[in-house]
Amino acid sequence: MRAERTAIVSGAGKRVGAFIAEALVGDGWTVVAHVHHSEDQVAEGTTKVVADLTDAACGAVIFDAAQNLPPVRLLVNNAARFAWDGFGEFSALQFDAHMAVNARAPALLIDELTRRHSRGDALVVNLLDSKLAAPNPDYLSYTLSKYTLAGLTELAARALAPRGIRVNGVAPALMLRSSGQSEENFEAMHANNPLGRGVEPADLVSAIDYLVDAKTVTGQIITIDSGHRFLGLERDVQFVGDA
């Protein structure tokens, strides 16, 4: 049974984060749903917490929302910044902004979990990107930030195993239409992989469920991409489809 356990999900007000939070509630978890804006909606049955992930105090703010709830046994670092830059258009501002949200905030949240974890087991799931297994230089700052998060996954797993905290990553392929991507392109590219099956948010939830139950798995990255990485594409999928 997973009752009397709390899960914290960052970026839980929209897209995949909202799907994860709702699924966890349905599976019996007490869920703290982080959002960036006070007007952001969250899944029914969750506890909403508003925090700016670029703020160094974000970890404490988010975990304070779980202070009177059951012990935190799951942290899903889902929130991510995804904005364009690339070689020839590289932006120091974009780099810093991506690193703050996609790498530093997860580190702060993991550190806060470490400070507050007293006994029992806990799991951190960092959401990565399947492009790390078949990289291309599009969305450069975003990609670099996800590489950093992948490194954090192993470092934290090594450091926190003696405390009973497991740290793993899940790296999904395209699940929902990206910003700037046409609906036509998404439909064409979603199932453009060797298995011929587009990755869905439910597949991501299944991977998280597996990691919750796999008590001896830590420091691993699960790529869920229907073999998309085998295609070895040189551009982001939205550009390939429009070529």
PLM feature spans:
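Conserved glycine-rich cofactor-binding loop
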Residues: G13
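Conserved glycine-rich Rossmann-like NAD(P)H-binding loop of the short-chain dehydrogenase/reductase
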Residues: D27-Q41
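Conserved NAD(P)H cofactor-binding loop of Rossmann-fold oxidoreductase domains
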Residues: N78-W84, G227
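Substrate-binding pocket helix/loop in short-chain dehydrogenase/reductase
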Residues: G86-F87, S91-D96, M189
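Catalytic loop of short-chain dehydrogenase/reductase
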Residues: L123-T148, T153-P162, L174
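Short, small/polar-rich loop/turn modules that mediate ligand/substrate recognition or access, typified
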Residues: A161, R166, T218-Q220
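C-terminal substrate-recognition "lid" of short-chain dehydrogenase/reductases
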Residues: P201-I224, R229-F230
